[in-house]
Amino acid sequence: MAAAPAGVGRLEEEALRRKERLKALREKTGRKDREDGEPQTKQLREEGEEVGKHRGLRLRNYVPEDEDLKRRRVPQAKPVAVEEKVKEQLEAAKPEPVIEEVDLANLAPRKPDWDLKRDVAKKLEKLEKRTQRAIAELIRERLKGQEDSLASAVDATTGQEACDSD
């Protein structure tokens, strides 16, 4: 039997040590509770009860028979008209129809090599300019060659006419 009180004493000592550690933690974190260790929520509840004692009795759903209580009765609350607010919110929530022009090039399926053509297009522009210049130069050379042959043909025909007139 002597062991039982010693075990209880040890448990009480451990409980006191835990309380001290918790108190030290509360002080460290800045929480301030009552010294008797009651939690803060209990303190707030007790303070609320004190304030509640000083408030007047309000009767909302109870129809009293006593004249004194009838004076304390709260009138029926009228519901607030929310139809206008709801209509405004519904109108604000309606999405405005967005009409965009549809680009058929974006909708049509593309050929498998479209990206290659896009990449090569810049290089082809440079080559196209060179090609046009080369074609123009070839045409000029032919015209010069034809002018020379035309001039010789004209000279030849004039020479024959001169011979014929002799």
From Swiss-Prot:
Keywords carried by this UniProt record = Acetylation, Coiled coil, Isopeptide bond, Phosphoprotein, Ubl conjugation
- Modified residue Phosphoserine is at which positions? S149, S165
Q: Where is this region: Disordered?
A: 21-55, 146-166
Residue ranges crossing the lipid bilayer per the database entry: none
Q: Which residues carry this modification: N-acetylmethionine?
A: M1
Query: Signal peptide location in the record?
Result: none
Cross-link Glycyl lysine isopeptide (Lys-Gly) (interchain with G-Cter in SUMO2), residue numbers?
K94
Ranges of Basic and acidic residues composition bias in the record: 21-53
N6-acetyllysine is found on K53
What is any Pfam family matched here? Answer: cwf18
Where along the sequence do coiled-coil regions lie? 8-28, 115-144
What is the name of the protein in this document? Coiled-coil domain-containing protein 12
Which gene is the coding source of this polypeptide chain?
Ccdc12
